[in-house]
């Protein structure tokens, strides 16, 4: 059935962007790692510089999740063609710091067993994130200003977005938390998670253009998000809030992407 929200997820007769898998060096992690990069229609021929949106997956996902399950390329193609979103580059990272790439992939082309539990929420992803930005800004035609960078993620990726954006308060003017986990795991000793209140004060003191929080009414992280919003409210920090029906599901995360992307780089 045509019409409505589902049209944004379809391959329509509009100009299509390009999706590429790229390997980059992460000196912080001592690894060659893989990212997925969406460039908008016309990137190859325009000569223009573009803003960049870093889009992060949740627990159990990798750099393929937002393309395969999130319909990111279709959503961006359609929003850009409709004039609702600015043409932008979207960079999808792998938040499992022990992995080079999605299971079964390696920089040597060898199949690697995915046995160990990857490092996920202990500071490695956050501390190594500048390596990704350095690669993108060295290899793509991009605007290299805070006002031209956005970061958002779902669940664990929302957690990473929260902590990366407060750790590097001059990096992102647009932050999106989709069904985000909020607090680090008990016993986590990474300096990334220390002095959270002071870091938030610095971040919000620099007045990000958009700090957007979205969650479903029956999401198991709902209460965590209520508590986090109370902290922001108590300190007078400005954010926008979007509440949907339903829980911790891709149906919601796709909706959040369609709401968030049009607000970027305005």
Where are these regions (language model features)?
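Non-catalytic cap/lid and distal C-terminal segments of serine-dependent acyl enzymes
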Residues: 1-266
């Amino acid at each position: 059935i045509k019409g409505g929200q589902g049209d944004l997820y379809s391959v329509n007769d509009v100009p299509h962007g390009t999706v590429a898998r790229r390997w980059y060096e992460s000196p912080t992690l001592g690894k060659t790692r893989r990212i997925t990069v969406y460039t908008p229609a016309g990137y190859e021929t325009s000569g223009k510089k573009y803003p960049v949106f870093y889009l992060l997956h949740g627990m159990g996902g990798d750099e393929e999740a937002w393309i395969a399950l999130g319909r990111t390329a279709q959503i961006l193609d359609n929003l850009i063609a409709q004039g609702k979103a600015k043409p932008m580059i979207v960079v999808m990272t792998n938040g499992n710091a022990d992995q080079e790439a999605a299971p079964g992939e390696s920089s040597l082309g060898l199949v690697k067993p995915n046995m160990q539990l990857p490092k996920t929420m202990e500071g490695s992803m956050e501390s190594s994130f500048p390596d990704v930005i350095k690669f993108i800004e060295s290899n793509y035609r991009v605007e290299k200003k805070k006002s031209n960078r956005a970061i958002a993620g779902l669940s664990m990726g929302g957690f990473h977005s929260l902590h990366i954006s407060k750790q590097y308060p001059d990096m992102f003017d647009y932050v999106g938390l989709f069904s985000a986990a909020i607090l680090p795991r008990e016993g986590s000793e990474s300096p990334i998670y220390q002095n959270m209140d002071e870091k938030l004060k610095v971040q919000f003191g620099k007045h990000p253009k958009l700090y957007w929080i979205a969650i479903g009414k029956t999401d198991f992280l709902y209460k965590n998000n209520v508590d986090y919003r109370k902290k922001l409210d108590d300190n007078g920090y400005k954010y926008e809030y979007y509440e949907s029906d339903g829980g911790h599901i891709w149906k919601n995360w796709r909706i959040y992407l369609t709401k968030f992307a049009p607000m970027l780089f305005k």
